[in-house]
């Protein structure tokens, strides 16, 4: 609760029991909220450890977001009873695919494999087999494992740690399609035409044996360098099919954004050693297209058989967001077609307009923000971004609960039955959508903390970057190469009245005419990295449209070594919250108007005077000392900053 910005008094009994030490992170329950002359009181319930301990950022995020991270005793007992191999009795009613050369293609660090693929040419058509781990065979509705899985609804992925949806002996064991062992699976067997249309498909339970555990980079090397391998022929067939499906995707008008993903490499202490870009090659896209095809078939199968299930719905822009997008695009000389109801094709055409522009990635963010969030719902509204009339998640039942329910619904149709979850479909959709967002928020918190920790050693160093966002209180800059965002406060832009002009997405100086635009290249110095708020402050060295008029410190004056990285951009909305930068009011020379939301030196003096008066009044009051033991609580929630306007950028 960010309203609790003051110290919290802990109950003496709980303090005596846990004996926390200074610098430790604790978990406490609020007993009474603060009143006019009484602080909040909390009960200490857990001591997590020292703030600098390896993995502490994950422990904090788990508790901040209330992530279930320990399986119930009943779930653990039930999981132990699950066999570690396929039994003869499990094969009843299943198609035998053990001799079909299915392979898994995943990342180098993947541990759970829930999908395998196979493709072959049949005349002018292709046969595509997508085999998915049959989790529903082992996790039955409303049993102890299912109860815990539904509560979690998704696996949560942190750097160096995963909180799985299922117990490990299922997620990495009997349900994982590991190589050279028998596994139960649900299969989507498709025939795809030369034009990329799914001519026919069928679902059936099967038993399989993965013939190889391949990686994306390995497969890409075979494709690009024509290297020989026993599975090379099948990979070539899969790649030809992928190119057909990719062409169909473009014809369909699916919106496709290109962004740079990053990977954190850690040292032995669990802290970031370096951040490197992850190259997304055609091997990644190949598997993605295979999974999309199976997901579409699952949605159509359930609709055709009139069985309720959780569909993955993604709606287009709301009228308000559409109007905002059109206004911003117009100022940039761009236009979105489609009138009041633009289609995915209109969005795809817009993306083609700005391809190659220096601000292309920022325009992608604007387009994404105009769309609504994808959710799980028991009715089908289609998927705007993928340009599908019907879409469901079928391919990841090990890590997503909605996929598990889709498997159960498909099996029910095959057995001429009906599957109804204990929680009604609508409530289940709301719950699983919430858990998905919660997991994303927790992962983002941890990544931001780790990035901030990494930047602590870079304070004083100079980086090149690109303006990736702006508000009435400053500029957000994404640093080249390391893809980390920081804030340059508007009061640090120079000796002028700087105003934020949202209608043109620019910050402009009144007298100098200096303008900062989205996508502009700038040089910045790292001023501060605040671990409590996971925010990074930067100061401007050079940049803007009238650089010669600005009085700023040069690189030579600062004596800092300039770090120049390769130009790249990672879309990371979570880092777009500024932190308060403490500077003496006398040194703040920027002059700003009230609407710019910047504290001037005069305002600083007034605040200082008020603070002194308040202190004097407090000294005159005769207060009785509290008998409670007072310990300042460290949490991952950020306390509100004092500077006016330093709110989270939306």
Predicted regions and their residues:
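Short terminal targeting/anchoring segments and short Lys/Arg-rich nucleic-acid-contact patches
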Residues: 574, 598-602
């Amino acid at each position: 609760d960010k309203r609790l910005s003051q110290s919290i008094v802990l109950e003496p009994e709980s303090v005596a029991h846990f004996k926390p030490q200074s610098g430790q992170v604790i978990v406490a329950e609020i007993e009474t909220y603060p009143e006019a002359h009484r602080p909040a009181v909390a009960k200490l319930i857990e001591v997590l450890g020292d703030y600098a301990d390896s993995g502490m950022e994950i422990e904090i995020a788990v508790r901040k977001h209330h992530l279930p991270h320990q399986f119930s005793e009943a779930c653990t007992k039930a999981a132990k009873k699950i066999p570690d191999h396929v039994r003869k009795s499990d094969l009843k009613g299943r198609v035998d695919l053990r001799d079909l050369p299915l392979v898994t293609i995943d990342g180098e660090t993947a541990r759970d494999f829930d999908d395998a693929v196979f493709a072959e040419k049949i005349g002018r058509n292709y046969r595509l087999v997508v085999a998915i781990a049959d989790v529903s065979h082992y996790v039955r509705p409303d049993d102890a494992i299912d109860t815990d899985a539904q509560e979690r609804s998704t696996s949560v992925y942190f750097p160096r740690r995963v909180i799985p949806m299922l117990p490990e002996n299922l997620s990495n064991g009997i349900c994982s399609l590991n190589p050279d062992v028998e596994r139960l699976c649900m299969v989507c067997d498709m025939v795809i035409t030369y034009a990329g249309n799914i001519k026919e498909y069928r679902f059936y339970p099967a038993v399989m044996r993965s013939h190889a555990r391949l990686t994306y980079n390995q497969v890409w090397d075979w494709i690009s360098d024509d290297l020989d391998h026993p599975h090379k022929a099948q990979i070539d067939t899969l790649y030809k099919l992928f190119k057909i499906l990719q062409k169909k995707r473009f014809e369909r008008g699916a919106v496709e954004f290109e962004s740079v993903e990053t990977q954190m490499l850690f040292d032995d202490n669990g802290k970031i050693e370096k951040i490197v870009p992850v190259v997304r090659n055609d091997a990644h896209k190949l598997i993605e297209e295979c999974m999309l095809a199976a997901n579409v078939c699952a949605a159509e199968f359930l609709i055709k058989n009139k069985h309720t299930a959780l569909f993955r719905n993604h709606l287009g822009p709301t009228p308000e967001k559409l109007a905002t997008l059109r206004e911003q695009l117009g100022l940039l000389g761009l236009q979105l077609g489609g009138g009041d109801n633009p289609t995915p094709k209109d969005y795809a055409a817009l993306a083609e307009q700005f391809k190659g522009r220096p601000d292309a990635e920022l325009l992608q963010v604007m387009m994404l923000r105009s769309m609504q969030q994808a959710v799980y719902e028991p009715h089908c509204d289609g998927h705007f971004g993928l340009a599908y009339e019907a879409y469901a998640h079928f391919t990841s039942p090990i890590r997503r609960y909605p996929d598990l329910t889709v498997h159960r619904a498909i099996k029910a149709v095959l057995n001429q039955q009906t599957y109804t979850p204990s929680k009604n479909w609508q409530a289940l959709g709301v719950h699983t959508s919430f858990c998905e967002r919660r997991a994303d928020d927790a992962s983002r918190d941890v990544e931001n903390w780790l990035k901030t920790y990494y930047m602590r050693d870079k304070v004083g160093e100079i980086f090149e970057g690109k303006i990736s966002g702006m508000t009435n209180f400053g500029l957000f800059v994404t640093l080249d190469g390391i893809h980390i965002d920081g804030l340059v406060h508007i009061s640090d832009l120079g000796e002028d009245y700087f105003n934020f002009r949202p209608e043109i997405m620019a910050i402009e100086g009144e007298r100098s005419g200096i303008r900062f635009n989205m996508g502009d290249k700038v040089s910045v110095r790292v001023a501060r990295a605040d671990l409590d708020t996971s925010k990074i402050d930067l100061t401007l060295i050079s940049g803007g449209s009238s650089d010669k008029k600005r009085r700023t410190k040069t690189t030579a004056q600062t004596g800092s070594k300039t770090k120049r990285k390769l130009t790249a951009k990672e879309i990371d909305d979570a880092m777009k919250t500024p932190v308060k930068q403490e500077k003496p009011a006398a040194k703040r020379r920027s002059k700003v108007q009230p609407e710019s939301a910047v504290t001037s030196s005069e305002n600083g003096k007034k605040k200082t005077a008020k603070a002194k008066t308040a202190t004097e009044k407090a000294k005159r009051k005769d207060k009785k000392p509290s008998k409670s033991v007072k310990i300042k609580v460290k949490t991952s929630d950020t306390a509100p900053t004092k500077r006016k306007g330093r709110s989270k950028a939306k």
